[in-house]
Structures are given as structure tokens and as C-alpha cells.
Amino acid sequence: MEHSTIAAIATAPGAGGIAVVRLSGPESYAVAAKVFHPANPAKRVEEAKGYTALFGHFMEGEEAFDEGVALFFRAPHSYTGEDVVELSCHGGSAVARRLVESCIAAGAAPAAPGEYTRRAFLNGKLGLTQAEAVMDLISADGRQGAALANASLNGALAKKIGAEKDALTALQAHLTAWVDFPEEDVPALEDAQLVSTLTTVKGELDTLIRNYDAGAVLREGVDCAIVGRPNAGKSTLLNLLAGFDRAIVTPVAGTTRDVVEQAVRLGDIRLNLFDTAGLRETEDAIEAEGIRRSWKKLDEAGLILAVFDGSAPLTREDLALAQRCAGRPAIALVNKEDKPTQFDAEIIAGDFAMVLPVCCQEEGSRRVIAAAVARLLGTNNIDPHAASLSGQRQLAAATRARDAVAGALDAVSGGFGLDAVSVCVDDALDALCDLTGENASENVINEVFERFCVGK
């Protein structure tokens, strides 16, 4: 690990009330003393106690170019576990950049992306799952997603995995003693005891894996295709969900010829909406290309909102769309419920998770759709304060552990002997150690921290 003192802007770029430049490393106080002069000449930066603040001026040589506050943190009681000084200057890129340049001229090195959190991990201040949660919390733009990240940052996932590891470790100790030291008269484990422990662990891992997709939706959002025949109300729906006139709406069929994109927040879920061209047979080459893109977006989407005209009978295009949505996370929206209904929803009901009568011009339908989307994607069943998996790395490790425990259960039921059970339990423990970062290679650590921005 590099033990140099590093400096970087820790706040988002652009104009703002303040900007923070963070120093971390053994020379943080010495560097700060060169670039920050307390307003009270009796105060010395080098002698500042942890968890204290001083007001003063930021210096480049003999020139004071700004005034602000320095916050001091003594090792190991800091984010990184090192001496840390946070220098708060006026916001805007010019002043903050000049302050960083002054710190570098005074002996600090520029921080790499994620280097502060990487040092926190290497110094034992955070586990790997907690470090990953830092990035999730920074990226969160919904309350539930932020709560999930905060729970992991506070150790919810590490504690949950730790409990399953403890159960398997105790089981493995007994298995090892019985297999390796038969002369010691170690009592054999009863199959019922083995099955009970393994089943409990497998159930906990199954729950984590089952909830992964809903957690990912809350953290990352989901791509949502709005599809249907021309003039069914797709663009009106886009405008309703967006809260403003994002797409052009006219009585002319085929107004939308290309995909119109808009990110919206529906309840606590971020939807990346794709309003698509109306699905119909056409001789127009441009419209045909738009329709091809519509089908492509439908196939790629994590959520489908299929819009049907409730004031007209089902058509061949409607039936083709319903068949294409079968088995997918799709909701049928029978639009124009304010008009006499000619649409037989029962014919398509089996192809959709749910069928909802709506009026895409009314705000009440927005609330109905939001509740249905949350129910379909499972986000309303998530406890935001519970342990949850984040990212493919964690999911893959948890899945390997679950499959190994399932293999141990198969070994018990198949009568393959305790040696076979022990091998499977070992594999499960290795996978759980990979998840928590105890077995993490340098490549894995690099992959985790390359997602971070400079300054965190």
C-alpha cells in the first residue's frame, strides 16, 4: 500500500456554496500547515486535535487566495484510518483547483479514483461490501435505494454473511474432527442436524439472491419500453409519467417515428422510458425502421408498458404484441377508460402480469401505474434496512455459496458420506469469503474501486 499523502476535491464539480479538498496520509497536517493559515495566530495546524475546526486563509506562497475552514481528524479516527484534513473553501472550480494545486506543491500527491475508500478498506475501516455500498450510496437517487446502500454501509450484509459463515464454520469443524480424528470418539453428526443447519443457511442465501433483482431496480433503475398500436396513447402516457409534454401528441397515426427517451421517477423507482413508434404494417421505409426499433426496445426492456386502445376492438397488431409480451415483465394498460369500452381484455390477460384500465390523460392513472410497477418488480416487498446484495460480484459469490450448500444437502440425502459434505461446505465458505472480501485478489479489489470517482 502506498503511504503517501494524497489530495483531491471531494465535492461534486461546478458552482456551489463550498468545495472540500481532502488530504489523507501521514503528512496531511504538514501539508495543511503550508496552505492554510489560521486566522488566530496563536493556533497551530500541526497541534490541532482530532474532530476540531479552525477558520483561516488558504495560501499559495505568501498570497491568500480564499478563506474557509479546516477540519482535522487524527488517525485512526478518520474515514481512511489515516490523518485527514478537510479544507472547505468557496465553491467553484477555480478556487478548489488552485487549493489542490497548492496542496500538491506542498508535498501531497494527486489521489487516484476511489483511493480514499480503498485506504479505508486496506486499513480495516470498511469491509469490501461496505466499500461497495459507499458507491451505491453516492449513486442513489431514491430513498429506498439510498436506504439499502446505507444498510450495507452500516454492515447489514457483512453481518448476515458472517452469521451464515459462523454456522458453516461450526459445522465444518465438527465434520473435520469426525473425519480426521476417528480415534478421538468424536460423536458423528446426525443427518437431521446436518440437514437443519444446511437448510437454514441455504434459505438465507436464497432470500438474498431472490431479492437481488428488486434491489437492483431500486439502486439502478430499469429500462421501460412503452409499446402499442398508433394512437393507443403511448406518447400521452410518456407525458403523464414525465410530468410535462416530452413527446408530440397529435390525432395523426404514426406521429412518433423514432424512439423518444426520458428518465422519470415513478414512486421510488427510476424508469428510463422509451416511447416507441406505433406497431402496424406500413409501406413507409422510415416508419418501418421506427417499428423495427420498437420491437428491439421491447425485447431489451426490463419492464414493458403495453398500451391498448380501450375504445376500439382488439386488432391483429394487438394480439401480436400480447404474444410478444408473454412471459415478460409486462403490464397491459387499456387506455381511454373515459370512453365506451369495446376492448375484450380477457383475451390478452394471460399474456400479461396484470391488465389495468387507465386514462393516460389523468393524474390518478399515474398513481395506479406506479403501484402496479412496484408490485410487479417486487420493490414494495423489500425491507430497505435489511441485508441485500449489490452488483454482479456479490450475486455471483452468493450464488456459488448457495449452490455449494445445495450440493452438501444432496450429498447427505444421497448417502455420499461426510467427506463429500465437507468438500461442499468448504466450497461454500470460500465463496462467502470471496463475497466479504476476505479472499479478494488484487484484481477484484481493483475492479471494485475503479467504479469510484476521484475524491472518494
Model-derived features: positions:
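Short glycine-/small-residue-rich Rossmann-like dinucleotide-binding loops
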Residues: 242, 277-278, 302, 309, ...
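Short, Asp-centered acidic motifs that coordinate Mg2+ and/or phosphate
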Residues: 271, 303, 331
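Generic enzyme active-site microenvironment
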Residues: 273, 307, 333
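Switch I (G2) and immediately adjacent beta-strands of P-loop GTPase domains
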Residues: 55-65, 70-74, 254-282, 300
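A glycine-rich (often HGG/GG-containing) alpha/beta subdomain
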Residues: 1-147, 151, 155, 331
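Inter-motif core of Ras-like GTPase G domains
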Residues: 287-311
